[in-house]
């Protein structure tokens, strides 16, 4: 996810490459950004010390070691901390980051999805101990890489399922519809192109007019026609139920 975020920031309008420092313990992971103009380091402390916004995007099992590593170099009076780690509570993070004088950083729990690489993410933001101005700054950054929603920590699990796991669910529909297109007689590449453009068209319509999906479905559903027959077959097979069950299953840890 960290690499996807860097790609999105580089394609965006807020950061110049020289504004970004990327840190990873493995040089090989940094090599893909060698020609991008960003600063590269294998020292997390070096990366964190000079940043205005420190973003930690790591696997859950290494989060504690990374956060404790950078605590001593962070200046909580001027720096904000963004943590992109699924399932990690803010209380735990703040306990790890608490300094001897009891101070903690302005914290943001952030969950984007992989489409952030193309500036098409749906990103959830939870401010913890942050000012309105700080929250405005972080939201602007993630609005530049798609769309963002400032929400409550209790909804992060559901948001992860709906938007992050949801990418995979949407792609599974694309795969299924593409395979159906092949069975109907199209070449595989043509079928995928047709399905992708159709999905894009559906999304564009909903974004443009704000209608409920069912209102748009009604526009193309003629009584006794092909569309309603297909929809009913999908429902008989449990389409809506399967989607909801998948979403609910994805929120259980």
Language-model regions: role of each:
Residues 108, 156-161, 213-218:
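Short pre-catalytic strand/loop immediately N-terminal to key active-site residues, enriched for Gly-Thr
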Residues 16-19, 77-79, 189:
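Short acidic capping loops at alpha-helix termini that bridge into adjacent secondary structure
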Residues 1-42, 46-50, 120, 182-184:
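NAD(P)+-binding Rossmann beta1-loop-alpha1 motif at the extreme N-terminus of oxidoreductases
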Residues 196-253:
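NAD(P)-dependent Rossmann-like dehydrogenase/reductase catalytic/cofactor-binding core
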Residues 92-106, 122-158, 169-210, 253:
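Internal alpha-helical scaffold of NAD(P)-dependent oxidoreductase catalytic cores
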Residues 27, 36, 44-125:
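Rossmann-like NAD(P)(H) cofactor-binding subdomain of soluble oxidoreductases
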Residues 20, 30, 47, 63, ...:
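Small-residue helix-packing motif on alpha-helices
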